[in-house]
């Protein structure tokens, strides 16, 4: 990244990243404004499974919010629900750990209450992702589920979700 002239930014819980709008002007990112907020891990967090040290990021742009938790398990989800509660509510959820049965707990989904969820996984992958029980929890929450194995690329643009260039 450095050779390509890309800035590297190390973040942890409580840090935020400003979002530039289309005009190039910057907004100040904080808990109330547009930006990306890191919810986890903090400098003192530890885990036996390195997947549980993935960044958990919440994106807010004024019209839209989404949460991205990498490969965290239900154990980290539980910590976050206990800490943030209703503040976790979002429009969009990128399913943790490719829709693994070890993530996407009922309490997590209830706290997020997403309208859309994206599951990133290949068809017929060796892990069996996504797990039926994880998808059932999303369906029980009346969440529209998008799968990259069916739709390919999923994009967010101007407060809309697009599957492979279809809204």
Predicted regions, residues:
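Non-globular, low-confidence helical/coil segments that flank catalytic cores
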Residues: 1-167
């Amino acid at each position: 990244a450095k050779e390509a002239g890309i800035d590297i930014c190390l973040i942890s819980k409580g840090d935020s990243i400003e979002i530039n709008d289309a005009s190039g002007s910057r907004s100040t990112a904080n808990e109330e404004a547009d930006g990306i907020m890191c919810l986890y891990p903090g400098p003192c967090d530890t885990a036996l499974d390195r997947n549980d040290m993935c960044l958990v990021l919440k994106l807010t742009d004024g019209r839209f919010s989404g949460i991205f938790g990498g490969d965290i398990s239900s154990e980290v989800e539980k910590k976050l629900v206990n800490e943030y509660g209703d503040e976790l509510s979002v429009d969009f959820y990128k399913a943790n750990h490719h829709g693994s049965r070890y993530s996407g707990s009922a309490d997590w989904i209830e706290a997020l209450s997403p309208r859309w969820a994206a599951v990133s996984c290949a068809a017929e992958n060796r892990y069996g992702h996504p797990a039926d029980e994880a998808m059932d929890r999303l369906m029980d929450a009346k969440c529209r589920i998008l799968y990259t194995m069916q739709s390919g690329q999923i994009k967010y643009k101007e407060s809309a979700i697009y599957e492979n260039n279809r809204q």
